[in-house]
């Protein structure tokens, strides 16, 4: 028979009493009434906030979007296949946030900032709210520094500044993504952090973009946020805000950032799907009433910060797809009215072999020449005027049989100017090369060449100028002015190269 030692028992009880920690926890718990199509209806979550994260019994996270008198409408961040009717749901008391750090550079992540490139976890000590308020008027300053895209047509006639929002709009397969990716490639060595957000794209298209960045060394300063076409609507809706939060992290650390949204119309479609399933009343094109606010609160986060906040910047390039050139549809008109200008890509120009297929006539930058260096302003003013006159003349010349010599010359000049705007994909040009190209065209040095020879001549001229007249590049990059000395050097190079080129062509 075992003997019970009273002192041992009393010691154990005393220890347990000392270790007892009286902690009162209030947990807000509800019950699943209905689940399906990425939406759950919850009963009993009385004190949940709008936009609060809720956790289901089997681990799925959701966002409380509809707060109704009898239940709460929650959108699921996952397939939610294991959620059962009657299971419990817990309110977390948190709003959606993501970890942020320098370690994200060079990585491919999803809308929840989890890596999807198979290269392990990303370390981060800080976190940011996915949705945070845009900088106010006092916190900003006007845009004055250029963000070079490397594309002559844009940098000369539709210039983009750091902190600007410029829409890239056009039909499918007109090179919209190519313009955006070329801009990222051109930021190499410019100390600009780039974020590329792919919303509802094909996984193969995203992989192609990532491969291009890796081959060209652009992933060193780029983060790719990808939610492909098979992702749940909730994650497609969140992806742009995740990208903006990452770009903001760098912006508030006195860095310059560039963010590409490809494309917000897919985000609007995902939001429409969520809203209709939540039984919100539909409006124009079945979009909910707050679809304008969906995009405005995203794009307003792009800014050029004032000196008190460190002069960082976030430049946004949203890409919107139109249906057979219709820019008067709901989402295109919304985004046009939010942004500071648009670059319009035309299917007709693309099919005619003019690539990048930028329709300069209806594209506009509301920042204008404030976002150009002085040297570019000096040579580019003439280009836009001559191209506009050429477009008008070309339409007229189709009906006229006999044209006078001056008109013929103007048409010939216009055709050569159009030729110099053509560029291969993933071949951005430096500002110095652009200035040299525009000057050569607008001052008539290409007029004596055949149209087919123009591009070959310009490529050879760029190489010749770089090797034989390096002072030209030094003058432009140091002074930012197209000085008389630079002009003289350029004229010499053009004459010398033209003689060599014409001799080569004879043999």
From Swiss-Prot:
Function summary: Produces ATP from ADP in the presence of a proton gradient across the membrane. The alpha chain is a regulatory subunit.
Metal-binding among keywords: no
Membrane-topology annotation of the record: Peripheral membrane protein
Protein's organism: Citrus sinensis (Sweet orange)
E.C. code: 7.1.2.2
Key words, A-Z: ATP synthesis, ATP-binding, CF(1), Chloroplast, Hydrogen ion transport, Ion transport, Membrane, Nucleotide-binding, Plastid, Thylakoid, Translocase, Transport
Family matches, as NCBIfam families: atpA, PRK13343.1
Listed name of the protein: ATP synthase subunit alpha, chloroplastic
Residues annotated as site: Required for activity: 363
Reactions it catalyzes: ATP + H2O + 4 H(+)(in) = ADP + phosphate + 5 H(+)(out)
UniProt enzyme class: translocase
InterPro entries in the record: ATP_synth_asu-like_sf, ATP_synth_asu_C, ATP_synth_asu_C_sf, ATP_synth_F1_a_nt-bd_dom, ATP_synth_F1_asu, ATPase_a/bsu_AS, ATPase_F1/V1/A1_a/bsu_N, ATPase_F1/V1/A1_a/bsu_N_sf
Pfam family, one: ATP-synt_ab_C
